[in-house]
């Protein structure tokens, strides 16, 4: 099972189940749009403040403080992550493209290795950039890494969902249950947008989608659950 870093949240374990949830979002689009944007913002802000203040995360985190500011954060996934198949751009392509753009644009890229990924390829790539001034490997706390980031890029890592609730500009190349809430990477050139200084604000529908998944994961309020049980 692929799990999000937020305590209490988990992503469904198979491609089939993810597909069902994507269909659910499509079918509930009208109801998602009916959610009060003020309510969505209030709930998300409350969670954001709680998790930033207490530095809560699903997995144990090392208390390694992040001193850098205004960087692009790339949390890596395990190569055999089943949900990563739901992307035209795999983790390797995303990593290599992000490193290239970081060096060209001289924008700091912080990469956090997944604790279960011991692949030779990743070790070689990370070893090759250890002396690059604009590429750093970090073991910092996920909450701190997201909070101080210009943007967060991933295939469809569960950290992306956490980043949405922490107010980050999130860019994904792979579909997921929260696909409607993120900025899309449809081709490698789109990755450059995540390195731009000015990041797009979340649209109302994106915020409502975020609240939708808070409800599904039991982290929000009963508001959406009540809305979905109404007639129509």
Predicted features along the sequence, with ranges:
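A donor-sugar binding/catalytic signature common to diverse glycosyltransferases
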Residues: 139-185
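Leloir-type glycosyltransferase catalytic cores
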Residues: 8-69, 181-232
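Catalytic donor nucleotide-activated moiety binding site of glycosyltransferases and closely related
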Residues: 96-137
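Short loop/turn segments at strand-loop or loop-helix junctions that form parts
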Residues: 69-81, 113-114, 175
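Mid-to-C-terminal functional-domain signal that highlights helix-capping/loop sites
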Residues: 84-94
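Generic beta-sheet signal
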Residues: 1-4, 112, 155, 173-175
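Structural motif
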Residues: 71, 108, 150-151
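Short beta-alpha junction loops
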Residues: 7, 113-117, 176-178
